[in-house]
Amino acid sequence: YGAYSRSIKKANKLKEKFGAEKSFDSLEKMLSDPEINFVYIASPNSLHYKQARMCLEAGKNVICEKPFFTNTKELDELIKISKEKNLFLFEAISIKYLPRLEVLKDLIKKIGKVSTCIINYSQYSSRFDKYKEGIVENIFTSKFSAGALADLGIYNLHLIYELFGKGDDFSYSGNINDYGVDIAGSGLISYKDLTVSFTNAKDCQSENFILIQGQEGYIKVCGNIQEAEKIEYFSDGKLNYLDIKDENSLYFYEFDYFREIYEKNDLKECEKRLKESKDVLEILEKLKKSTDI
């Protein structure tokens, strides 16, 4: 229906791209429009809280891009407002709703007790060449709560949480730039009898993969969870390959889910998802604290 940007020129481009009816360069004006009942926030990370709060206080439901907010205090405040106003508040994290995630969970049951998981999600940023020339954009400065862990690692954390739960001990070591964020790093999440390590980087190329090692076999997702097309798994003494291409686009499943529970007015289901998002945000906080970012 409507597109907002601080620049009306950019707002008009968004309007044309997505076939919206209106464009706004004032968030307040957009939020006063009675035809708008949902707002999707995809602004820099540090702006999520302020903009989401404005939307909720204006009576609008919110879908906010990952990472949800900078800390759990911000999330708790917005959950309180959303409950008081009976509004929906969702974190847009596509991997949680992909059919392939359920396929992966089922396969894990076939490889016995899992003891180790290794995940690599690295992606040479389209903005890194400019960064090397001294042009520092949002993703490479703490001013916008950015960095590799927040931008790419958040996918790793949600996946780890979905597969294994919250964890007990957390550590992270990052390559911290002069602007206070990690441009690459590796983390470790420990459980009672399981160790999960992950890498996320925005300054280098790599094969992306997920390797889950069990006592009776292993699983290798050939790529990151949202883009991989096949899974290799060893079980019962045999090496197998499984096609995991989804029928629909990456974002179809999460927005179809949001639509369904909104139409059912299922605020309890929304609360369940908010609890999951808070758990992952707590993990992110602990990892950042371990390396002082």
Predicted regions and their residues:
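Beta-loop-alpha module in the N-terminal Rossmann-like domain of NAD(P)-dependent dehydrogenases
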Residues: S7, F18-I81
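Hydrophobic residues in well-ordered beta-strands that form the structural core
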Residues: C64, L89-E91, V221
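NAD(P)-binding Rossmann-fold cofactor-contacting core
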Residues: Y1-K17
